[in-house]
Amino acid sequence: MMCGRYAISKVVKKTKNIININEGVEDSDNYNAYPTQLLPIIKKDGDILMMTNYHWGLIPKWSEKMSDFRPLNNARLETLMDKRTFSGLIAKQRCVVPADGYYEWRKNDEGKKFPYFIKHEHNEIFFFSALYQKNTNLEFSVITTEAKGTILDIHHRMPVILKEEEIENYLSSKDPMAFLNSHQNPELVFYEVGRDVNNPSNNFIELLDPA
């Protein structure tokens, strides 16, 4: 699974200059955010930017009676318009997900996986482009694209990552697919971290320490 864990800390403080309304998001730290959790997203409500909590992982209405269906944590940019689950959301149900960085697992020649933390080169908060829906739960899915540059050393996929000044363009775009397809991710850096992050129940700042 691509982009299945990330870290976000002091999200209220870090977004205070861009958010107009905070709908119940607390300024807590989450160093091991994982799918199904209730996590902060930012979306437009008319002309204002609102931050609220949604569950990570879309469950389409057509799958609600399928007991073995796995929530869709990621949405591939290349096939967004081909998938009925996502094609109806891209026009008006776009959001961004604030993050300090995300975890990815690198596989060595023996098939063993080692976790890495990937972040902005200047330690700035960034934002995953995402889609949301209001179904039985409030849910979102992170949009991913082909990895480029040094990130390919870790994984062949990565989130579509926005800088703060790009949020409005994405959320307000009249042609969001053109925006996403022409978008260039910011420069990122990465380093290996300890295996404590493998356990979703672990949630402490030391998860970010280099291995």
Show where each model-derived region lies.
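Short linear sequence motif anchored by a di-proline
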Residues: M1-A211
